[in-house]
């Protein structure tokens, strides 16, 4: 009789086995194939799967799908395709074999199969037990648009350069510019426009930036990779004939003009793309602008000022001033033009009164080199002079007054004022930009165009610091292993000496035993002779024999004792040899690790030295400056063709933009965009607003093979080339997969990494390992050679929600639903400490920069640095992220507000919705 173990699933009653009758089986006449997906799977789900699934597989039999069924159970195969009568699944379901399925009085209340169901099961097996479930699975599942009420922030990521923060609200991804706090809009998958226009159809469970600024987002069964787009070239205008020097724009941004070194002016009409060229000057143009009535105003180095209408080419008003003109600005609502002259005087002319001079402003002690107006009605302007000062002027009724003087420390070559009248900026032909507060004349920021390279230098400096720490730790470990090696060598020497001594002692005792045996034999012979002869000395012979026997027994015991000691000495020597071998191996490993650490440090130090040399050598030259239309940013053009930007509130660096042109000669804001005129004679309007495009998708909504369920966690490798994802089927599996970012192909995987879903994942700092946190209460580490388990850490008493590596790679930290943070020694595989303080689950964990301080966030409405709460978390925090350098923390939660703190002062910097 065949037997299959279902004992834990069966209420075995002997009388049932003896007396129970087989279940009735219907007679069916069906020519078409029985469908597993349609006819059999629902039956198993109703009556069998409660006890036979991936989580609870009684007798190791899983009936969830055909492929796992075919693997059989503890006892072997359970389905024989083509022969139902030999298939235990059918026999036990039909109660034709003991161990009925489902068992009588089962706890799941699973019913017996009906006659028709048994008939279909039998026919399906006889037809070959074919699997059409994959076909059924391919049927498209329709997803409805997610409600806008689902807007909690479940995922947050900070870009490696601190410029951007991504926040996953519900199924939408919002991007923010960290320095300015401006919203950059949403990331949208165009294929989902019919579902509300979102990034994912399901909650965005994970976000991560790589070292190149690529953003990865995880949703249901898919990962999406978003790449920051190049600046948008809005208008590639007709080039000028000679090198451009200045540019201007009308108040409505419909017209813009460029003046060149030959005296020509081109006016571009945005709507029609028409270009009109004027040649009203014979020397280099030093200023262009638009006055009331559409007048085009221009000045040239030879002191001429011109005013004309676009459509009236013949009507040109000109006037020559008494000093060469270096700069011009339209002021006073477009009714006047201010001219900065070589003699240090600013001359103000009336545009409507045929360029009649109405004011002469004195104050500068050297030539005026730059002018910039501000305010909606252009009632104010700023002047910059070779005397190294900036002066702020206010236009009143019939007069112009100087209201502020600012010492710029060096002569500016270009200045700009913000439209809101709060800031002015200057560049002086070097890498510096100065941003000033116009209300009090105080310096807001002293920026440097080399900030990005300096930031890279700092990053490499941090790496050198970490590698120095690793090198020092490896030195310490080598010292300890050398000490252990020496101790084990000494122990072996002692063990060998003891063994040698015990061998010598044993040989001695064995010789004594031989002598004792000889004496005992002689005593026995003597005793026997005296007994036979009835010798009167028989008594003394007996005593002598007794003593000889006792001496022999004593020597035998001594030999046994020495043999035992010799065996112990041999074992001690063998143990010492094993310990010494381990010590030799450990010492060799320590030496290799130290050599690797020293080599890594040497290479990193060289890279740092090279970058430092570049910082010292590369002198950026900023030549022109302008503010954005909203006054939030200031842009500076340089000799290297790049456009550099800073936010204006505190002067934090924003971006370095490759305008793909030569040396920048003039820049000006055109609405929300920037006009760039370059030495290569190009005139282009750019939209520098950062945007991201969907670059690649991994997996799909209908594809459960690539990614089985939600992607709860993502982590890029240090070089940004690999992406690790963590997920799985809740209560069933933990899915760890590693992807090649370039082509989206799978590199390695471990789909049985955990017994429950992975909730946190992190690449080690050297990229050789991946740490995972899962709801099965384990923290695990897998190597990159096939995602093989390297370490397993047990200690959390509830779901583990996140995991992070310390920068040196020696220690990991994890946070869990048990409200604690734990630190683990990776190489020793042991727990270092448990940190308490949170009163709800710890949702995110990270180390701050290259240090040892921990950042933790929790549902208890707190984000903490070293267990000290930051101000105003004030909501259930689902996710937090710390910048690579540890200077800012971003967090979001149930109230949908993105909060950003600066770690240096623990202050809330931004609250964004």
Where do the PLM segments sit?
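Bacterial N-terminal signal peptides
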Residues: 5-16
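Secreted/processed peptides and extracellular or luminal domains of membrane proteins
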Residues: 15, 54-57, 795, 837
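Residue-level signal for beta-strand positions within conserved beta-sheet cores that form or flank
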Residues: 16, 59, 732-734
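Aromatic- and Gly/Pro-enriched helix-to-coil junctions and flexible linker segments
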Residues: 19-164, 169-172, 179
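WD40-repeat beta-propeller superdomains and closely related acidic/aromatic-rich repeat-like regions
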Residues: 131-913
């Amino acid at each position: 009789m065949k037997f299959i173990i279902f004992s834990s699933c069966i209420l075995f009653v002997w009388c049932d086995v003896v007396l129970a009758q087989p279940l009735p089986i219907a007679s069916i006449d069906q020519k078409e194939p029985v469908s597993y997906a349609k006819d059999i799977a629902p039956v198993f789900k109703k009556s069998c799967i409660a006890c036979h699934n991936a989580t609870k597989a009684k007798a190791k039999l899983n009936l969830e799908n055909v492929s796992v069924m075919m693997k059989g159970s503890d006892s072997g195969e359970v389905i024989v395709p083509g022969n139902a009568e030999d298939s235990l699944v059918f026999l036990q379901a039909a109660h034709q074999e003991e161990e009925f399925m489902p068992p009588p009085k089962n706890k799941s209340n699973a019913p017996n199969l009906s006659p028709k169901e048994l008939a279909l099961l039998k026919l399906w097996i006889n037809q070959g037990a074919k699997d059409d479930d994959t076909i059924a699975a391919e049927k498209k599942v329709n997803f409805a648009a997610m409600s806008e009420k689902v807007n909690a922030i479940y995922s947050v990521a900070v870009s490696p350069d601190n410029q951007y923060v991504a926040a996953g609200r519900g199924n939408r991804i919002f991007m923010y510019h960290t320095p300015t706090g401006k919203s950059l809009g949403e990331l949208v998958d165009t294929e989902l426009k019919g579902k509300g226009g979102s990034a994912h159809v399901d909650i965005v469970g994970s976000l991560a930036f790589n070292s190149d600024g690529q953003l990865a987002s995880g949703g249901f069964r898919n990962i999406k990779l978003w790449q920051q787009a190049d600046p948008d070239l809005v208008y590639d205008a007709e080039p000028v004939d000679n090198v451009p020097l200045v540019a201007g724009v009308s108040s409505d941004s419909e017209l813009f003009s460029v003046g060149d070194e030959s005296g020509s002016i081109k006016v571009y009409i945005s709507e029609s793309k028409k270009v009109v060229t004027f040649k009203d000057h014979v020397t280099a143009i030093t200023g262009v602008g638009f006055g009331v009535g559409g007048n085009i105003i221009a000045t040239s180095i030879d002191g001429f000022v011109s005013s004309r209408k676009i459509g009236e080419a013949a009507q040109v008003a000109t006037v020559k001033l008494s000093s060469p003109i270096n700069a011009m600005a339209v002021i006073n609502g477009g009714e006047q033009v201010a001219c900065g002259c070589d003699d240090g005087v600013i001359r103000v002319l009336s545009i409507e009164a045929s360029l009649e001079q109405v004011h002469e402003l004195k104050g500068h002690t050297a030539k005026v080199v730059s002018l910039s107006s501000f305010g909606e009605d252009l009632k104010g302007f700023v002047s910059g002079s070779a005397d190294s000062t900036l002066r702020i002027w206010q236009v009143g009724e019939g007069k112009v007054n100087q209201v502020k003087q600012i010492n710029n420390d060096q002569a500016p070559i270009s200045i700009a004022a913000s439209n809101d009248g709060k800031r002015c900026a200057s560049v002086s032909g070097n890498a510096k930009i100065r941003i000033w507060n116009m209300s009090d004349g105080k310096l807001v920021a002293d920026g440097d165009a080399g900030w990005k390279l300096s930031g890279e230098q700092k990053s490499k400096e941090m790496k050198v610091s970490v590698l120095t720490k690793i090198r020092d730790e490896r030195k310490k470990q080598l010292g300890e292993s050398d000490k252990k090696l020496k101790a084990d060598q000494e122990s072996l020497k002692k063990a060998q000496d003891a063994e040698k001594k015990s061998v010598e002692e044993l040989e001695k005792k064995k010789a004594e035993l031989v002598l004792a045996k000889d004496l005992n034999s002689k005593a026995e012979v003597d005793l026997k002779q005296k007994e036979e002869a009835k010798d009167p000395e028989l008594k003394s012979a007996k005593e002598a024999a007794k003593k000889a026997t006792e001496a022999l027994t004593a020597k035998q015991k001594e030999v046994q004792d020495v043999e035992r000691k010799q065996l112990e000495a041999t074992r001690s020597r063998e143990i010492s040899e094993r310990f010494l071998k381990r010590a030799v191996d450990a010492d060799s490993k320590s030496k290799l690790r130290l050599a690797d650490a020293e080599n890594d440090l040497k290479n990193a130090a060289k890279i740092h030295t090279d970058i430092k040399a570049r910082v010292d050598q590369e002198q950026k030259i900023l030549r022109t400056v302008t503010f954005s239309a909203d006054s939030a940013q200031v842009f500076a053009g340089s000799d290297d063709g790049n456009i550099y930007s800073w936010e204006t509130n505190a002067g934090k660096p924003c971006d370095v933009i490759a305008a793909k042109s030569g040396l920048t000669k003039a820049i000006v804001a055109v609405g929300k965009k920037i006009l760039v005129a370059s030495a290569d004679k190009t005139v282009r309007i750019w939209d520098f607003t950062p945007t991201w495009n969907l670059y690649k998708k991994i997996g799909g909504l209908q594809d459960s093979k690539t990614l089985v369920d939600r992607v709860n966690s993502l982590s890029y490798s240090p070089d940004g080339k690999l992406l690790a994802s963590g997920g799985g089927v809740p209560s069933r599996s933990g899915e760890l997969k590693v992807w090649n970012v370039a082509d989206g192909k799978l590199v390695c995987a471990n789909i049985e990494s955990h017994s429950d879903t992975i909730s946190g994942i992190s690449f080690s700092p050297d990229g050789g390992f991946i740490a995972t946190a899962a709801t099965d209460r384990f923290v695990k580490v897998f190597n990159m050679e096939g995602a093989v388990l390297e370490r397993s850490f047990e200690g959390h008493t509830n779901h583990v929600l996140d995991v992070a590596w310390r920068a040196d790679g020696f220690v990991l930290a994890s946070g869990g639903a048990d409200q604690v943070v734990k630190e683990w020694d990776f190489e020793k595989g042991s727990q270092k400490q448990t940190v308490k303080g949170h009163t709800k689950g710890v949702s995110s964990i990270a180390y701050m920069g290259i240090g040892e301080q921990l950042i933790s966030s929790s549902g208890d409405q707190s984000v903490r640095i070293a267990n000290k709460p930051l101000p105003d978390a004030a909501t259930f925090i689902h996710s937090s992220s710390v910048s690579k350098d540890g200077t800012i923390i971003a967090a979001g939660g149930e109230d949908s507000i993105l909060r950003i703190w600066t770690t240096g002062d623990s202050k809330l910097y931004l609250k964004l919705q």
